[in-house]
A protein has these predicted regions:
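Zn2+-dependent metallopeptidase catalytic core
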Residues: 29-54
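N-terminal low-structure segments adjacent to metalloprotease catalytic domains
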Residues: 1-17
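Long, well-structured alpha-helical subdomains associated
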Residues: 127-163
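Post-HEXXH active-site segment of zinc metalloproteases
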Residues: 87, 91, 103-138
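Active-site scaffold of zinc-dependent metalloenzymes
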Residues: 59-90, 100-104
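Histidine-centered divalent metal-coordination motifs
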Residues: 95, 99
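Predominantly extracellular/secreted Zn2+-dependent metalloproteases
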Residues: 2, 51-64
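Acidic/histidine-rich, surface-exposed loop or edge segments in extracytoplasmic proteins
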Residues: 13-28
Length: 163
C-alpha cells in the first residue's frame, strides 16, 4: 500500500481500487458526495481509457486534500486523490487523469525531484499560483480538462450509462 493511502482509509471497491478516508463515514454529507464520486469513477473509467493512455492499477483515494488543492496524482505510486468535498469532481478527475497519462506516456517525468517535460528539464515551480499554473503539464491539464470531461460524459450518455 502506498503511503498516500492511510491505514485508516477503507477500501470500498477493488476494481478499480478506491479508498475512502475514514472521516467520510462519520459525515452524511461527505458520505453522499463520496458515493456519487465512487459511482462516477467506476462508470467513467473505461471511457477515459478510450481517450487517454492510462497506466493499469491506478488507485483512487477520496478524502480531504490539504490547502487549495482539489486533487493530485502521484506518478510513481499511481495514486489519484480527489477532495471528497468537491461538487465538480468530474472536472478534477479529468485533470488528474491527464496527469496520469502524462506520467504513463513519459511526457512528464520526475527524477530526484527534478521535473522533465518531453525530455527537457523544467525549472522549479515558483511560489505563486501563476507560476504553478504556467508549468507545461498544468497548462495541458487545465486546457484539456473541460473538453475531456465533455467527451467522457457524451460517451457515457450515448452508451446509456446511468450516472
Amino acid at each position: 500500500m502506498s503511503h498516500y493511502i492511510k491505514g485508516s482509509d477503507k477500501l470500498v471497491c477493488k476494481s478499480p481500487a478506491i479508498y475512502v478516508s475514514s472521516q467520510v463515514f462519520y459525515n452524511k454529507d461527505l458520505y453522499d458526495k463520496a458515493a456519487k464520486q465512487i459511482k462516477f469513477i467506476k462508470k467513467s473509467l473505461k471511457f477515459y481509457k478510450t481517450i487517454l493512455s492510462l497506466p493499469k492499477g491506478i488507485t483512487f483515494r477520496l478524502g480531504s486534500v490539504k490547502g487549495s488543492v482539489n486533487g493530485y496524482y502521484v506518478g510513481k505510486s499511481k495514486v489519484l486523490g480527489l477532495d471528497v468535498k468537491l461538487v465538480d469532481y468530474s472536472l478534477v478527475l479529468s485533470h488528474e487523469l491527464i496527469h496520469a497519462s502524462q506520467f504513463y506516456t513519459k511526457k512528464l517525468n520526475v527524477k530526484q525531484g527534478t521535473f522533465y517535460w518531453n525530455g527537457s528539464k523544467v525549472g522549479r515551480k515558483g511560489t505563486t499560483f501563476n507560476s504553478y499554473r504556467n508549468q507545461p503539464w498544468e497548462v495541458e491539464a487545465y486546457d484539456g480538462q473541460a473538453d475531456l470531461t465533455r467527451k467522457v460524459i457524451e460517451a457515457m450518455m450515448s452508451s446509456n450509462v446511468d450516472f
